[in-house]
């Protein structure tokens, strides 16, 4: 089945927000990593065979405009809640990838009854166990940071090939936005764990067993914080599960969302 994807620009909070949309069925909002979004991933196509898939570029990332006032993932969460209201879609499920998982968790905490389901994949936003840390982009190169998110370096090469100048520039911008919105404390919220207990949406936590960016202990913390959450660990998989193990992640997500 060939999925038709459309690209539009929405004006939200004075920001030109780029939105890719495809498929049909119940709505699913997919929120991308801190390194930005790769267009037309097989994972997205698999979701779009069952769902109406919405993939925005975070404000300041990719093709979306940078708001000078943006300072936190919670700001981005509010923008996306506004986007969904303008699109007049309801009963939306959220899939958050890495940094996007943090945003999805913030959305769910702000509107505990509004979302049909929550899938967090290697999500930032919660502090790992004592002695463990979320990988710091500031101390590695633009290429080494995304590479470290793959269990198998061949998977990185399959997605990115020979890294272009345009890609390096996109990672540079993404890194700047990550620092602007998640610097102190770095990549986690001191308040979020205390606010997730009110979330009514069923939640699935997915983690790669070799995630070297966000430690597995953060996933376990999410599973404890979200009432009744299920957790699955994907073998031979790093942080970027949607790129490294698209079939496995798509099956997990589709099976979970189809039960809701």
Language-model features: locations:
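Conserved HGGG/HGGXW glycine-rich cap/lid loop of the alpha/beta-hydrolase fold
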Residues: 11-65
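Acidic beta-to-alpha connecting loop that harbors the catalytic carboxylate
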Residues: 24, 34, 209-211, 236-238
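Active-site loop/oxyanion-hole signature of alpha/beta-hydrolase fold enzymes
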Residues: 54-95, 251
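Flexible "cap/lid" loop of the alpha/beta hydrolase fold
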Residues: 102-110, 115-147
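Conserved alpha/beta-hydrolase catalytic His-Asp/Glu region
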Residues: 129-135, 143-201
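Short beta-strand/loop motif that positions the catalytic acidic residue
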Residues: 199, 205-207, 211
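Conserved alpha/beta-hydrolase "acid-adjacent" motif
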Residues: 212-218
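Catalytic active-site module of serine/aspartate enzymes centered on a nucleophile-bearing elbow/loop
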Residues: 229-260
């Amino acid at each position: 089945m060939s999925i038709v994807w459309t690209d539009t620009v929405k004006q939200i909070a004075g920001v030109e927000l780029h939105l890719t949309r495809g498929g049909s069925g119940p709505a699913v909002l997919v929120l991308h990593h801190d390194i930005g979004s790769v267009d037309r991933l097989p994972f997205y196509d698999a979701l779009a065979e069952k769902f109406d898939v919405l993939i925005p570029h975070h404000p300041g990332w990719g093709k979306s405009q940078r708001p000078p006032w943006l300072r936190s993932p919670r700001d981005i969460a509010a923008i996306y809640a506004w986007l969904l209201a303008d699109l007049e879609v309801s009963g939306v499920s959220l899939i958050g990838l890495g940094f996007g998982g943090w945003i999805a968790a913030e959305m769910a905490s702000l509107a505990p009854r509004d979302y049909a389901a929550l899938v967090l994949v290697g999500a930032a936003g919660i502090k790992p166990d004592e002695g463990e840390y979320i990988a710091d982009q500031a101390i590695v190169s633009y290429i080494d940071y995304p590479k470290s998110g793959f269990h198998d370096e061949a998977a990185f090469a399959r997605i990115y090939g020979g890294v272009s100048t345009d890609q390096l520039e996109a990672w540079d911008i993404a890194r700047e936005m990550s620092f602007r919105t998640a610097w102190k404390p770095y990549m986690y919220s001191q308040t979020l764990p205390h606010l997730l207990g009110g979330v009514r949406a069923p939640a699935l936590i997915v983690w790669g067993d070799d995630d070297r960016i966000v430690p597995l202990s953060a996933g376990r913390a999410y599973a404890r914080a979200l009432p009744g959450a299920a957790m699955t660990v994907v073998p031979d998989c790093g942080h970027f599960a949607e790129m490294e193990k698209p079939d496995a992640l798509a099956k997990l997500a589709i099976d979970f969302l189809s039960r809701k």
